[in-house]
From Swiss-Prot:
GO terms for biological process: photosynthesis. Its main location: plastid. This is Photosystem I P700 chlorophyll a apoprotein A1. [4Fe-4S] cluster binds at C573, C582. The keyword Ribonucleoprotein does not apply. Chlorophyll a' binds at H675. It is a multi-pass membrane protein. It comes from Olimarabidopsis pumila (Dwarf rocket). PsaA and PsaB bind P700, the primary electron donor of photosystem I (PSI), as well as the electron acceptors A0, A1 and FX. PSI is a plastocyanin-ferredoxin oxidoreductase, converting photonic excitation into a charge separation, which transfers an electron from the donor P700 chlorophyll pair to the spectroscopically characterized acceptors A0, A1, FX, FA and FB in turn. Oxidized P700 is reduced on the lumenal side of the thylakoid membrane by plastocyanin. The gene is psaA. The chain crosses the membrane at residues 70-93, 156-179, 195-219, 291-309, 346-369, 385-411, 433-455, 531-549, 589-610, 664-686, 724-744. Keywords: 4Fe-4S, Chlorophyll, Chloroplast, Chromophore, Electron transport, Iron, Iron-sulfur, Magnesium, Membrane, Metal-binding, Oxidoreductase, Photosynthesis, Photosystem I, Plastid, Thylakoid, Transmembrane, Transmembrane helix, Transport. Signal peptide: none annotated.
Length: 750
């Protein structure tokens, strides 16, 4: 008789047909809430409808149902992303000068939008070179298309159609996984399987397939393009994939196939998997062979990482065990209890993810200019400035979002009864020490950083330049930053074998790289001016963190309002009869944090814009003389507040202010309009609810007189709604103003 061990049961991880598909229900506004579904009595109804439509916590308290809604919504999000991408590729296929740009990227600007001749607006179609008239784009799509090996507008058209198919597929998946086969809660909480798929699947196989595409398609096509071959003469991508001899003509070791790989003779592949560092002097971008090598290495790391966690086979790490093994000398039980928080509160999980993704986005912003990844990106100054600014704003918003969801977690998902003495509890118990120390740091940084500028303005005003903090008088050199730069500049040849240049030309040491008479990149000198503005960065970042962290740590209770958790995430004040308790909700901290985030990012992008125009961007003569756009005035002008106002804001605004009558005039209109949107926000931020309610009742009286009064009673915005509308217009107006100012300037002079 053979005794077999019992077969492991296969877990059923989906429910079939859990929720019927009902168009009648979807057609009813507010179907997710009993109160809202009744329809409007007052105009507040439309605000509540928008506030709660995606607040799945308010629809149900069942974690499984909430998880399914979030999961389904993610597919909707992906569908929109594919739709947007399809639109970008379609514009490239149908309305752009991509093929012309590809044949001469140094003299022709990228354009993918041609304005129709209505009311004379065709003036916006500027001459971008090569006889093409259109709006210059600054998204970097042309550069990424060239890097990926796209050589014709037909290929863009096919990709656009493919993206539409994927958009439809994602919409279907969102419906299918909510209405037809919805995952159970256990599936959402199986973190090891999730890590397996995300690390090995998305990141590992994703990077591997991109590396494969780069080696087999991008590298050979870019090799031909760099050599000046007409794009129409270059073989099509599938020919390189199917015909190995074609590749072997460019990279002889291809003839040997996979033999060197299996015989561990990997150096054979060093023709197309390189480790050079620095920039390709032809295109001013990173070496594409370095990039292919990088993605192959990343793929291997993530394929290994994806197999480190215990799934169906009972081998490998468990995340809960790893977390609970982490104990420091001062942390008591260590990370015990964190696993339960992160698998039962999606807000806590989202908060961590937003904080990391936001930081990563800001890191991307800094790498896009210091290690420009795509061909001819570094010399397209308008695109460089746009990419930096865009990624900085996005990163700022994501980090504020991290604080918002951390606070929502504290209010809605935190259970103090079973959280006793874990790490989070220990942080909360000494929150006063954290916040008061952080407050001291903010005061110190604010007074000292601003004080250095005020000193310089005063000395400058009194005609005492020898007493100013500057590179030519009292020097405050950023010695630590210079040491880091120097270390990196000396690194090649010492760290990685065969590396000929440092990771970025900005570190120093290397020569400058110029493409078509324009500077791509050169060593960036740091001096007193940078020291001063970096301390302003430190100040604004710390204040933003102070506001956001105070909102999180005091989200449930404070000395002022011990029962804050009962009032919820957003509330205007602690009821009538308790003065001085307004603006204390966690939501209000996010609201205030947004303004300081805007402050912080504005200083960063202003610093970047001026520094690059002054010390990096410019033209180079045949004799090798570099002429920078603003002639190196950053070091001496940016050390006073007056210098920032006079030589940056005012001097560089001339292009946008004088843009009327030119192809840049749309930026002039946007500059004006966005200032108006910004000013409009102040009406919401500086006036109270009662003022508007009085006005509304007077207007309603007039409507009653004329017998045109609506059935839905008009109401003034609530305090929280007013603040939300205010901060939205403040940020939108401010960002659009900056966008118009930057682009009109850099397109005109860059």
């Amino acid at each position: 008789m053979i005794i077999r061990s019992p077969e492991p049961e296969v877990k059923i991880l989906v429910d079939r047909d859990p929720i019927k598909t009902s168009f009648e229900e979807w057609a009813k506004p507010g179907h997710f809430s009993r109160t809202i579904a009744k329809g409007p009595d007052t105009t507040t109804w439309i605000w509540n409808l928008h506030a709660d439509a995606h607040d799945f916590d308010s629809h149900t308290s069942d974690l499984e149902e909430i998880s399914r809604k979030v999961f389904s919504a993610h597919f909707g999000q992906l569908s929109i992303i594919f739709l947007w991408l399809s639109g970008m590729y379609f514009h490239g296929a149908r309305f752009s000068n991509y093929e012309a740009w590809l044949s001469d990227p140094t003299h022709i600007g990228p354009s993918a939008q041609v304005v129709w001749p209505i009311v004379g607006q065709e003036i916006l179609n500027g001459d971008v070179g090569g006889g093409f008239r259109g709006i210059q784009i600054t998204s970097g799509f042309f550069q990424i298309w060239r890097a990926s090996g796209i050589t014709s507008e037909l290929q863009l058209y096919c990709t656009a159609i493919g993206a539409l198919v994927f958009a439809a597929l994602m919409l279907f998946a969102g419906w299918f996984h909510y209405h037809k086969a919805a995952p159970k809660l256990a599936w959402f909480q199986d973190v090891e399987s999730m890590l397996n798929h995300h690390l090995a699947g998305l990141l590992g196989l994703g990077s591997l397939s991109w590396a494969g595409h780069q080696v087999h398609v991008s590298l050979p096509i870019n090799q031909f393009l760099n050599a000046g071959v007409d794009p129409k003469e270059i073989p099509l991508p599938h020919e390189f994939i199917l015909n190995r001899d074609l590749l072997a003509q460019l990279y002889p070791s291809f003839a040997e196939g996979a033999t060197p790989f299996f015989t561990l003779n990997w150096s054979k592949y060093s023709e197309f998997l390189t480790f050079r560092g620095g920039l390709d002097p032809v295109t001013g971008g990173l070496w594409l062979t370095d990039i292919a090598h990088h993605h192959l290495a990343i793929a291997i790391l993530f394929l290994i990482a994806g197999h480190m966690y215990r799934t169906n086979w009972g081998i490998g790490h468990g995340i809960k065990d790893i977390l609970e093994a982490h104990k420091g000398p001062f942390t008591g039980q260590g990370h015990k209890g964190l696993y339960e928080i992160l698998t039962t509160s999606w807000h806590a999980q989202l908060s961590l993810n937003l904080a990391m993704l936001g930081s990563l986005t800001i890191i991307v912003a800094h790498h896009m200019y210091s290690m420009p990844p795509y061909p001819y990106l570094a010399t397209d100054y308008a695109t460089q400035l746009s990419l930096f600014t865009h990624h900085m704003w996005i990163g700022g918003f994501l980090i504020v979002g991290a604080a918002a969801h951390a606070a929502i977690f504290m209010v809605r998902d935190y259970d103090p009864t079973n959280r006793y003495n874990d790490l989070l509890d220990r942080v909360l118990r000494h929150r006063d020490a954290i916040i008061s120390h952080l407050n001291w740091v903010c005061i110190f940084l604010g007074f000292h950083s601003f004080g250095l500028y005020i000193h310089n303005d005063t000395m400058s005003a009194l005609g005492r330049p020898q007493d100013m903090f500057s590179d030519t008088a009292i020097q405050l050199q950023p010695v630590f930053a210079q040491w880091i730069q120097n270390t990196h500049a000396l690194a090649p040849g010492v760290t990685a074998p065969g590396e000929t240049a440092s990771t970025s030309l900005t570190w120093g040491g290397g020569e400058l790289v110029a493409v078509g008479g324009k500077v791509a990149l050169l060593p960036i000198p740091l001096g007193t001016a940078d020291f001063l503005v970096h301390h302003i960065h430190a100040f604004t970042i710390h204040v933003t963190v102070l506001i956001l962290l105070k909102g999180v740590l005091f989200a449930r209770s404070s000395r002022l309002i011990p029962d804050k958790a009962n009032l919820g995430f957003r509330f205007p004040c602690d009821g009538p009869g308790r003065g001085g308790t307004c603006q204390v909700s966690a939501w209000d901290h996010v609201f205030l944090g947004l303004f300081w985030m805007y402050n912080a990012i504005s200083v960063v992008i202003f610093h970047f814009s001026w520094k690059m125009q002054s010390d990096v961007w410019g033209s180079i003569s045949d004799q090798g003389v570099v002429t920078h756009i603003t002639g190196g005035n950053f070091a001496q002008s940016s050390i006073t507040i007056n210098g920032w106002l006079r030589d940056f804001l005012w001097a560089q605004a001339s292009q946008v202010i004088q843009s009327y009558g030119s192809s840049l005039s749309a930026y002039g209109l946007f500059f004006l309009g966005a200032h108006f949107v910004w000013a409009f926000s102040l009406m919401f931020l500086f006036s109270g609810r009662g003022y508007w309610q009085e006005l509304i009742e007077s207007i309603v009286w007039a409507h009653n007189k004329l017998k045109v009064a609506p059935a839905t009673q008009p109401r003034a915005l609530s305090i929280v709604q007013g603040r939300a509308v205010g901060v939205t217009h403040y940020l939108l107006g401010g960002i659009a103003t900056t966008w118009a100012f930057f682009l009109a300037r850099i397109i005109a002079v860059g």
